[in-house]
Amino acid sequence: MAMAYKMATEGMNVKEECQRWFMEMKWKKVHRFVVYKIDERSRAVLVDKVGGPGEGYEELVAALPTDDCRYAVFDFDFVTVDNCQKSKIFFIAWSPTASRIRAKILYATSKQGLRRVLDGVHYEVQATDSSEMGYDVIRGRAQ
């Protein structure tokens, strides 16, 4: 039986699969990113797309629609100035300018409920266009 986590702010449910895919990304490193969407009819947060281990940041950006909101988590691997391999998990709240106002409000009010379920996120980025979440922005936040 599928378990769901209740979001207090909007009466939104976070499906158990959302946390499961996140934990697989975090601990097993079998995914590079997970994109989440809200299904307005069922009032639930669902997994929209999962990026395989060979996919990178460009594929994540390409998976985000230009006219609808999404949440995403990305496992960013990088090398520090001390030549140490590190990994940081980013939560991205994607709310493009072309998306519906209702969707923007729904995603904004439901964000914290999903964040509580995704334990282990290091940084959060809110973006309305691709320049606000460019690779250099992500790399700069991680270091």
Curated annotation (Swiss-Prot):
Keywords: Actin-binding. GO terms for molecular function: actin filament binding. Coiled coil: none annotated. GO terms for biological process: actin filament bundle assembly; actin filament depolymerization. One of its GO terms (cellular component) is cytoplasm. SMART domains: ADF. Pfam families: Cofilin_ADF (PF00241). Residues 11-143 form the ADF-H domain. Belongs to the actin-binding proteins ADF family. This is Actin-depolymerizing factor 5. It comes from Oryza sativa subsp. japonica.
